[in-house]
UniProtKB/Swiss-Prot annotation:
SUPFAM superfamilies, alphabetized: L28p-like (SSF143800)
Top-level taxonomy: Bacteria, Pseudomonadati, Chlorobiota, Chlorobiia, Chlorobiales
BP-aspect Gene Ontology terms: translation
Cystine bridges: none
Family in the record: Belongs to the bacterial ribosomal protein bL31 family. Type A subfamily.
Gene assigned in the entry: rpmE
Keyword entries, A-Z: Ribonucleoprotein, Ribosomal protein, RNA-binding, rRNA-binding
Pfam family for this entry, one: Ribosomal_L31
Listed Gene3D superfamilies: Ribosomal protein L31
Role played: Binds the 23S rRNA.
Keyword rRNA-binding listed: yes
InterPro entries: Ribosomal_bL28/bL31-like_sf, Ribosomal_bL31, Ribosomal_bL31_A, Ribosomal_bL31_sf
GO cellular component: ribonucleoprotein complex; ribosome
Protein name from the UniProt record: Large ribosomal subunit protein bL31
Subunit structure of this chain's protein: Part of the 50S ribosomal subunit.
Length: 75
């Protein structure tokens, strides 16, 4: 490897803007600020709210069934 061409790889503190949690990692940046971390993300905390897509799926199936029924009736 060539000398003096690589950036400094140091220990930095990652800070969450949402909950204020901070932890250390290594990076070429001086500090890292994230919007959401694993400490406050709904997927990791178990507070995940599922969006009700069942209505949309049922509506699609109903339209698809209507289209198939009309095309099979015309054949």
């Amino acid at each position: 490897m060539k000398k003096d061409i690589h950036p400094k790889y140091t220990t930095v503190t990652v800070t969450c803007a949402n909950c204020g949690n901070s932890f250390e990692t290594r990076s070429t940046k001086e500090s890292i600020k994230v919007d959401i971390c694993s400490n406050c993300h709904p997927f990791y905390t178990g507070k995940q709210v599922l969006v009700d897509t069942a209505g949309r799926v049922e509506r699609f199936k109903k339209r698809f069934a209507k289209k198939n029924a009309s095309s099979s009736a015309s054949e």
